[in-house]
């Protein structure tokens, strides 16, 4: 340990220093100096490598003041040019294409669009797969260009808002339950057929059922009976000719015996009634029905 001596010197006084004065050099020498230089050189190399990697990443990713590559940052949001591939789910408030091009969503498996509430629960989902298109929602609706509902579906009912529902399949339309509609008709020059292969077919209307064929015939076929019944009104057959074909021809019985047979009589207004059969007509005797 070195002890330093301090001497007070006045002006004009000369003091000689001792010859054995010790001189100390301040600094880093030897292997410590070489290690420090090596460490600084290593830091400089790392800095150069980092700068080169940063420049390479900026060049590869196409970073620019307005965005990254085809992805541009605008005041309205993000604008993406060209085709892009998303490896993970995409969350966005609005997705739209340019004015002069269409929006294309494509996937090798399926495309799923989901809507969630504030709690994260799915409230609506559209899934486009290879075999089918699945829509999961409480209410599904398709509108026209002017906002008019064309088709809507709920758990209770399905509504078709077009002026006409057309089924072009060769087997027609199959309904497992009842159908409510104001009009059922076929295309021009085509047949209309209502069929129930294994059950009955019923048509009900509170104000009447109107069946009309403008350019053809109306045919009703049944393996059993065809019953035309009116509880309060009359059954009217309005035609120039009314024909009953394939009627059985009766055989002649004993004279003076009707055997419970009746003849059909007609009033001037077309009303039909029965009269006891006899050797001659008895319609005039029972014509008071026409009054």
UniProtKB/Swiss-Prot annotation:
Extracellular-facing ranges: 59-291
Cellular compartments annotated: Cell membrane, Sarcolemma; Cytoplasm, Cytoskeleton
Glycan attachment positions: 110
InterPro entries: Sarcoglycan, Sarcoglycan_gamma/delta/zeta
GO terms, biological process: gene expression; membrane organization
SS bond list: 265-290, 267-283
GO cellular component term of the entry, any: plasma membrane
Keywords annotated in UniProt: Cell membrane, Cytoplasm, Cytoskeleton, Disulfide bond, Glycoprotein, Membrane, Signal-anchor, Transmembrane, Transmembrane helix
The keyword Membrane belongs to this UniProt entry's keyword annotation: yes
Membrane topology label: Single-pass type II membrane protein
Chief place of localization: membrane
TM region positions: 38-58
Tissue expression profile of the protein: Most strongly expressed in skeletal and heart muscle. Also detected in proliferating myoblasts.
Ranges facing Cytoplasmic side: 1-37
Function statement: Component of the sarcoglycan complex, a subcomplex of the dystrophin-glycoprotein complex which forms a link between the F-actin cytoskeleton and the extracellular matrix.
Assembly: Interacts with the syntrophin SNTA1 and FLNC. Cross-link to form 2 major subcomplexes: one consisting of SGCB, SGCD and SGCG and the other consisting of SGCB and SGCD. The association between SGCB and SGCG is particularly strong while SGCA is loosely associated with the other sarcoglycans.
Record family assignment: Belongs to the sarcoglycan beta/delta/gamma/zeta family.
Protein name in the entry: Gamma-sarcoglycan
UniProt organism field: Mus musculus (Mouse)
Gene name of the encoded protein: Sgcg
């Amino acid at each position: 340990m070195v002890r330093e001596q301090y001497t007070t010197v006045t002006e004009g006084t000369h003091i000689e220093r001792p010859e054995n004065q010790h001189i100390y050099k301040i600094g880093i020498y030897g292997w410590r100096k070489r290690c420090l230089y090596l460490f600084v050189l290593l830091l400089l190399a790392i800095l150069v490598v980092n700068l080169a990697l940063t420049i390479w990443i900026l060049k590869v990713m196409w970073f620019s003041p307005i965005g990254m590559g085809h992805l541009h940052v605008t005041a309205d949001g993000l604008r993406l040019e060209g085709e892009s591939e998303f490896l993970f789910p995409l969350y966005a408030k609005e997705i739209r294409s340019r004015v002069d091009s269409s929006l294309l969503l494509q996937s090798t498996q399926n495309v799923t669009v989901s809507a969630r509430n504030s709690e994260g629960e799915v409230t609506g989902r559209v899934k486009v797969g290879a075999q089918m298109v699945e829509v999961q929602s409480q209410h599904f609706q398709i509108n026209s260009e002017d906002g008019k509902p064309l088709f809507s579906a709920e758990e209770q009912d399905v509504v078709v808002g077009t002026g006409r529902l057309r089924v072009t399949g060769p087997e027609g339309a199959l309904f497992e339950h009842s159908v409510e509609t104001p009009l059922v008709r076929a295309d021009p020059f085509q047949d209309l057929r209502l069929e129930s292969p294994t059950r009955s077919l019923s048509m009900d209307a509170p104000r009447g059922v109107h069946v009309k064929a403008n350019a053809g015939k109306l045919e009703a076929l049944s393996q059993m009976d065809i019953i035309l019944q009116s509880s309060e009104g009359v059954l009217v057959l309005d035609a120039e000719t009314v024909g009953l074909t394939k009627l059985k021809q009766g055989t002649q019985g004993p004279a003076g015996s009707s055997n419970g047979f009746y003849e059909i009589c007609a009033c001037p207004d077309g009303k039909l009634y029965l009269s006891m059969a006899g050797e001659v007509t008895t319609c005039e005797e029972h014509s008071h029905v026409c009054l």
